[in-house]
Amino acid sequence: MRKRQNYMNVKLGICNFCVPGTGVFAPQIVSEMGLDGMSIEFGSYEHGWALSQKKIMDLYLDAQQKYGIEYPNIGCSDGDNVPFYTPQGDPMYDAVQHWVTKAVDAAAYMKIPMVFFSNFNASLADTEEKLENTAKRYRYLCDYAADKGIEISCENPLSVEKQLQLVEMVDRENFSLFYDSDN
C-alpha cells in the first residue's frame, strides 16, 4: 500500500487495541493502512503486563523498523481494572507500583517519549482522598521518569476544575493531561 501524501506535516496514528489483530502484528496492519504510527498498550494484570517483557518489547521494536511506523506513547489502560490510586498498606500497592514503574522502564528501553495512564472505572479519583493518592503516585512516576526523558500523562473523565487541581497537585514539568475525543 502506498503511504498517503502528507501536506501539513500531520501524522496520523491509532491505538493498538483499535486495530483488528492487536498485539505485535498490529504494526504491519497499521503500516498497510497508511498510518504513521500507533499507541502501544502495556497490557493487563491478568496477562502479566506483556510489554514489561523484553521479548515483547523487542518484537515491537523489530516491527517498528520493518514497517517504518512510530510509537508515540505507551497506553496503560489497566487502570480501568486496577486502582491507580491504591495507597500504601493496601494489598495491591506493590502490584500497582510494579505496573507503573515497568511501564516507564518499557518506554525508556523502547525510546518512547510518553506513558499515559487511564484513570477511569477502578481508577476514577472521585473523592479528595483518591485524588491525593492519584497525585502522589503521579509525582512519584514523574520523578522516576524525568531522568529518562519520559513524559507522564493522565487520561480521565474528571471535570476541568478537578483536572486542573490534579495538575497543580502533581506539579511536575513532565506531567500532562491526555485527551481522547472518544471518551
Model segments located where?
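Active-site acidic/histidine proton-transfer and metal-coordination neighborhood
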Residues: 3, 65-70, 83-177
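Hydrophobic faces of well-ordered beta-strands that scaffold small-molecule active sites
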Residues: 10-16, 38-40, 71-76, 115-117, ...
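Structural motif corresponding to alpha-helix initiation and N-cap regions
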Residues: 23-24, 53-58, 97, 101, ...
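Aromatic-lined carbohydrate-binding surfaces of glycoside hydrolases
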Residues: 77-82
